[in-house]
Amino acid sequence: MSYRKLQRTSSQRRALLRDLTTSLIVNGKIETTEARAKEVRSTADKMISLAKKGDLSARRKAAAFMRDVVADVKEDGDNVAVQTALQKLFSDLGPQYADRNGGYTRIYKTMPRRGDGAQMVVLELVD
């Protein structure tokens, strides 16, 4: 299995991919460098494929990888419903992509970064 090292140690690289994948699932799109986006694309596709399975084993594998962050807060009078990134993945994204076999993300190139000229892209989930 080949992958990009992204100038980081394995633990730093794993943490970076966890954070970017979780941000992509919570927000629907992220802006990052091209190399990072191409790596996050593969991990995000794996997470959405787990969400499509929807069983307990898939939920535990996804929970072991993703960060435990709040994705959405809904207030209905006195009731407050908090949805985590994992819940959003399995309740919203899994059913949304049930008929799609891969290719859940799209990459758009944008302007180079001002400081170092690195190629920036927008990675977003396909509707």
UniProtKB/Swiss-Prot annotation:
Q: Which InterPro entries match?
A: Ribosomal_bL17, Ribosomal_bL17_sf
Task: Extract the Pfam families matched here.
Answer: Ribosomal_L17
Alphabetized SUPFAM superfamilies for the sequence: Prokaryotic ribosomal protein L17
GO MF annotations for this entry? Answer: structural constituent of ribosome
* One GO-annotated biological process of the protein: translation
Tell me the keywords, alphabetical order: Ribonucleoprotein, Ribosomal protein
Q: Name one GO cellular component term.
A: cytosolic large ribosomal subunit
Query: Assembly state and interactors?
Result: Part of the 50S ribosomal subunit. Contacts protein L32.
Similarity-based family: Belongs to the bacterial ribosomal protein bL17 family.
Protein name according to UniProt: Large ribosomal subunit protein bL17
What's the source species for this entry? Answer: Lactiplantibacillus plantarum (strain ATCC BAA-793 / NCIMB 8826 / WCFS1)
Q: What is the lineage of its organism?
A: Bacteria, Bacillati, Bacillota, Bacilli, Lactobacillales
Q: Which gene encodes it?
A: rplQ
